Structures are given as structure tokens and as C-alpha cells.
């Protein structure tokens, strides 16, 4: 179809840090090549980074690679996720403290430094609050997920809020972190309790993470073991920084944090003027448009997807985008803003390592071992489990539509738009631009897209991971794939793939959609793949 793909070099840029807030970041649509500067070796890989082979990339609509990838997704219903501190719910607290530095993006924003204190004037907007800096006396808007009530547990550097066990392990096990590094988070299993997660080391397991449940007393105190009780969490943490006292290791330093993404670019920056965007480096080109690295308002680095006129109706796109921006999860790429008149522009978070497919084939991903690959699959399942809970549908789940950031963080992109495409070679479902090899048979043949057809696609995506980006059904053309799958053919276990993972793939490929597992089950299976026989929480010595 004359679709071409170009890709630039890449380098580290935006890092991930889960927020201190009830629900993580926003949602989106986007895939593209990596940042055009230097190649940075993947810390988790066993070999050094390599140069990108730009000549071996194939066609995609928006610069992923391998085959055609439009964008993907459709919606039915959804639930609105509350922001960090929903309007009117600051509990009477008016003094908040900054958790991170922030550089103003507009004339209405306030720049501030970590530790700066604010009086909150108006928090009815949810994501962006009007505040007055106590230090400077200036008024302006601040991102609500960058602040916490002064002198609260949320303002403590070691408190990471609502974070799962697996995400805690990912952060603590990042390269460069030492034994004893720690964080405190909400308990996943016990309401009102907390968990202390510590990086440890032993001869059998090497680097690992231990989790200790912090329980709450009826009188408001806290303890890990009843023989050592504390009035506050702060006192508990201080005690264990001075003595291991039964833990695997005394607490040394707080786990490093990275600024979270703001919810949107700025207050009221949703439908933005085209002139506010500067397209700087073209990252990819495909059948339906281009992807650029650029800058918004001269201040903020973003990814910009430009759609060819006629790809979809602007009114339908804007309606779908309104739904997509309300979906927020730290494994979904946040949708920042749109230019809603043709040519449509879609503005999203920039992810430094580009698409998962390119990362596996041409980047540091080709050196990854099974534990890292399974963890990436678990992250994707985490994001899809959220989409499942929100009664949303992706429609085009594949490695080319997953973006990779620093430290192997994966985020789902390009959902919510596939059903809006008006190209005949795509809407025919068996046309040249339709991703047959990733699509469940009931969706390809009859247009029955559901979360269960997404589960089928996830099974195909798993083969992309373990084969480092190999095209599914090697040696077979689209029509042959459709015929053979209908007759019961399923891909054999890829070389080097454990049979237990192949069994999960086959569950995803059940002919009856109702027999396929939920993403909640898949996430749990993958997160516990290497640790299923270990206790979730450590009792500690003499505890």
C-alpha cells in the first residue's frame, strides 16, 4: 500500500514513577520510534546496546514496525477515575507541600521547587489547582498530583501510596539500587494497613525484594511485630533505619523517584491550537499518518501523531477522545491534548524507547531474558486488566502498539480509534491494512470485537515477546492464517519458550471467547510466574 516507516536513533528521556495518588496517570493513543539522539544500553540486558538498523523496518500506519498498525480500540462504557484529590475532598487541609520540582508551561502556571508550600485557593478543577506560594506570594495553577497535604504521610519521601507489590519490586530492583533501599505503600490485601518493601540479597536468590505488612493498632499506632509498636509510621520507619530488628536488613535509603506525568498539559489545555505545537523530529510514517517528537507551547516535550485528512470523521474522533482521556492508569500512555480540525493531531506522552516491536527487534530488547520478557507481558496485562474493568476494548493489541520507557516500563497505546477508521482496505477486516494475524477469528470474520478478542490478541503478542519481534504465523499469508485458525490450527510453542507460557497462549486462543481467561487472571499468572511458591509477605526473623 506504499506505507513506509522511518525511525531515528534513541536515547533516555522520560522516566516512570508511579504516582502517590489513588489512580495512576492518564490514557492515550500513540506509537512511534525512539528519541533521536544517542543509543542507551538497557540496564537489564546482558549485552551492550547496538546501533539501530534503519533499513530493516517494515510498514506501519504510525511508525511502529512489522506489518500494518493503525491505532486500535473501541469503547462501550467506562467509569470516570477520580483525580489525586477530588474537588472538595482535601479534608479541610489548605496547606500543601510540593513533592517534585515543576517548571511552568503557561503564563497561568506556577513554577516551584520540591518542598515549597502552598495555600490551596481553589481545587474544584481536580487535576489543576489554583494555589498561592507561601514563599513567593504568587498565585497560579499547579498540578494536583505534584503536591500532598503538609506534614502528612503522603508528603513523606518514602511513601509511594497505592502501588502494587510487583511495581514496588520493579522500582527497587532497578540497576544501581543497593541492598536496604526501601519504600512504604498501601497494602493490597488489608484495608488501612501498609506494606514495607525492602531490596535484599542472598546467595540463593541474588537480588530480591522482601515485603513486610505494617499493621494498624486500634489506638492508631503501627507495628510490624507486636513487640515493637510506634505512634506514627514516621517513627516506625526511623526505628528500622537504625536497627534491622528482625527485618532482612535495616532500611538504608529511600527508593529513588521520578516525576509522574501531569494529568494533561495544563489547565484547560485539551483542544489546543495547531500553532501551539512545533513538529521537530519525524519518528515514523505509515498508512494513516505520521508521528513526530515535538514541543507544546515552547515548554513541554510531547509525541504528536498527525492523521491524514479523511482517515476519520473529526466529530467521531473528538467524541472518542473525550472518553479516552478519562481512562487513567500507569500502564496506559496518557492522552494529553488534540487538534480536532483536519488534519487531526493527537498529543501524547513521549516514551523514550519507542515501540515494543522495534525495541525487541532493533533495540536493547533483543538481549532480554525470559524474566524481563515475562515482566513486560505482566505490565501489559496490568493495563489491559484496567481496560477490562472499565468495560473498554482495545481492538488492536500488539507489540507495535506498546511503548517502552526507561527501566523496561511498558505502556499500552493506540486504543480507542480503530473503529473510527474509514479506509476501505481496513474496514473490510480482511483488507491489506487490517492486522489479521493478531485478530480473533470472531472479530476478523464477523466484526465481534470484545475484551475476549483482546485476550486472543494478547496471546499473539506473547509470541512476539518470546521470539523478539518475529511476525506471527511465519511463512503464512493472511488468508491462509484465517482459514487454518478456523480449522483449529494454533501456533506451536516457540523455541525457548516454557510450555507453561505456551499453555497460557493456548488458553487465550480458545475458539469460544467465553473460555478465554480474563486479563485479571493473566496479570496474576504472569506477575507470580517466578514466585508462585514463595509467601507474599515475609515474617522476618523472630517476628
From Swiss-Prot:
Tissue specificity: Expressed in the epithelial cells of renal proximal tubules and stomach as well as hematopoietic cells in the bone marrow and spleen in the fetal tissues. In adult, expressed in epithelial cells of the renal proximal tubules and present in keratinocytes in the basal epidermal layer of epidermis.
Top-level class of the enzyme under EC nomenclature: transferase
Domain of life, source organism: Eukaryota
Residue ranges occupied by any SH2 domain in the UniProt entry: 158-255
GO BP terms: cell differentiation; cell surface receptor protein tyrosine kinase signaling pathway; cellular response to platelet-derived growth factor stimulus; cellular response to retinoic acid; cellular response to transforming growth factor beta stimulus; ephrin receptor signaling pathway; Fc-gamma receptor signaling pathway involved in phagocytosis; leukocyte migration
Residue ranges of the region described as Disordered: 1-45
Lipidation (S-palmitoyl cysteine): 3
Lipid-anchored residues (N-myristoyl glycine): 2
A GO term for molecular function: non-membrane spanning protein tyrosine kinase activity
Chain intervals with Basic and acidic residues compositional bias: 1-20
Primary residence: membrane
Record's function text: Non-receptor protein tyrosine kinase that is involved in the regulation of cell growth and survival, apoptosis, cell-cell adhesion, cytoskeleton remodeling, and differentiation. Stimulation by receptor tyrosine kinases (RTKs) including EGFR, PDGFR, CSF1R and FGFR leads to recruitment of YES1 to the phosphorylated receptor, and activation and phosphorylation of downstream substrates. Upon EGFR activation, promotes the phosphorylation of PARD3 to favor epithelial tight junction assembly.
Subunit annotation: Interacts with YAP1 and CSF1R. Interacts with CTNND1; this interaction allows YES1-mediated activation of FYN and FER and subsequent phosphorylation of CTNND1. Interacts with FASLG. Interacts with IL6ST/gp130. Interacts with SCRIB, when YES1 is in a closed conformation; the interaction facilitates YES1 autophosphorylation.
Family: Belongs to the protein kinase superfamily. Tyr protein kinase family. SRC subfamily.
Protein name per UniProt: Tyrosine-protein kinase Yes
Amino acid at each position: 500500500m506504499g506505507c513506509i516507516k522511518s525511525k531515528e536513533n534513541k536515547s533516555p528521556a522520560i522516566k516512570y514513577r508511579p504516582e502517590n495518588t489513588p489512580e495512576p496517570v492518564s490514557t492515550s493513543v500513540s506509537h512511534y520510534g525512539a528519541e533521536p539522539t544517542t543509543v542507551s544500553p538497557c540496564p537489564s540486558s546482558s549485552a551492550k546496546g547496538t546501533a539501530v538498523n534503519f533499513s530493516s523496518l517494515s510498514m506501519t500506519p504510525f511508525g511502529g514496525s512489522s506489518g500494518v498498525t493503525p491505532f486500535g480500540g473501541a469503547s462501550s462504557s467506562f467509569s470516570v477515575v477520580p483525580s489525586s484529590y477530588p474537588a472538595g475532598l482535601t479534608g479541610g487541609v489548605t496547606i500543601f507541600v510540593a513533592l517534585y520540582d515543576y517548571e511552568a508551561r503557561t503564563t497561568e502556571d506556577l513554577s516551584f521547587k520540591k518542598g515549597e508550600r502552598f495555600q490551596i485557593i481553589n481545587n474544584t478543577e481536580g487535576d489543576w489547582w489554583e494555589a498561592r506560594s507561601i514563599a513567593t506570594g504568587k498565585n497560579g495553577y499547579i498540578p494536583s498530583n505534584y503536591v500532598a497535604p503538609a506534614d502528612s504521610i503522603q508528603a513523606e519521601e518514602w511513601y509511594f501510596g497505592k502501588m502494587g507489590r510487583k511495581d514496588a519490586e520493579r522500582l527497587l530492583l532497578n540497576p544501581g539500587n543497593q541492598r536496604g533501599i526501601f519504600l512504604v505503600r498501601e497494602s493490597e490485601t488489608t484495608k488501612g494497613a501498609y506494606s514495607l518493601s525492602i531490596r535484599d540479597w542472598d546467595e540463593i536468590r541474588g537480588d530480591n525484594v522482601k515485603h513486610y505488612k505494617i499493621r494498624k493498632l486500634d489506638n492508631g499506632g503501627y507495628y510490624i511485630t507486636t513487640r515493637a509498636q510506634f505512634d506514627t509510621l514516621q517513627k516506625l520507619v526511623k526505628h528500622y533505619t537504625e536497627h534491622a530488628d528482625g527485618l532482612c536488613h535495616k532500611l538504608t535509603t529511600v527508593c529513588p523517584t521520578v516525576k509522574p506525568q501531569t494529568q494533561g498539559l495544563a489547565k484547560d489545555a485539551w483542544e489546543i491550537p495547531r500553532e501551539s505545537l512545533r513538529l521537530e523530529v519525524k519518528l515514523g510514517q505509515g498508512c494513516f499518518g505520521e508521528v513526530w517528537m515535538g514541543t507544546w507551547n515552547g515548554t513541554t516535550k510531547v509525541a504528536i501523531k498527525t492523521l491524514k485528512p479523511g482517515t476519520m470523521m473529526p466529530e467521531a474522533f473528538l467524541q472518542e477522545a473525550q472518553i479516552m482521556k478519562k481512562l487513567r492508569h500507569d500502564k496506559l500512555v496518557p492522552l494529553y491534548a488534540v487538534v480536532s480540525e483536519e488534519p487531526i493531531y493527537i498529543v501524547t506522552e513521549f516514551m523514550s524507547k519507542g515501540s515494543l516491536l522495534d525495541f525487541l527487534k532493533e533495540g536493547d530488547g533483543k538481549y532480554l531474558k525470559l524474566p524481563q520478557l515475562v515482566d513486560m507481558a505482566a505490565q501489559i496485562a496490568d493495563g489491559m486488566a484496567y481496560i477490562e474493568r472499565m468495560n473498554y476494548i482495545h481492538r488492536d493489541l500488539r507489540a507495535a502498539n506498546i511503548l517502552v520507557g526507561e527501566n523496561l516500563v511498558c505502556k499500552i497505546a493506540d486504543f480507542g480509534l480503530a473503529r473510527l477508521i474509514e479506509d476501505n482496505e481496513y474496514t473490510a477486516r480482511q483488507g491489506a491494512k487490517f492486522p489479521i494475524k493478531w485478530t480473533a477469528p470472531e472479530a476478523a470474520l464477523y466484526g465481534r470485537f470484545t475484551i475476549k478478542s483482546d485476550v486472543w490478541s494478547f496471546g499473539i503478542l506473547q509470541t512476539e515477546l518470546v521470539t523478539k519481534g518475529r511476525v506471527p504465523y511465519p511463512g503464512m499469508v493472511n488468508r491462509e492464517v484465517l482459514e487454518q485458525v478456523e480449522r483449529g490450527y494454533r501456533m506451536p510453542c516457540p523455541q525457548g519458550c516454557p510450555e507453561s507460557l505456551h499453555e497460557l497462549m493456548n488458553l487465550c486462543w480458545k475458539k469460544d471467547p467465553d473460555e478465554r481467561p480474563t486479563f485479571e487472571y493473566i496479570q496474576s499468572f504472569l506477575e507470580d510466574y517466578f514466585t508462585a511458591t514463595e509467601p507474599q509477605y515475609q515474617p522476618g526473623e523472630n517476628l
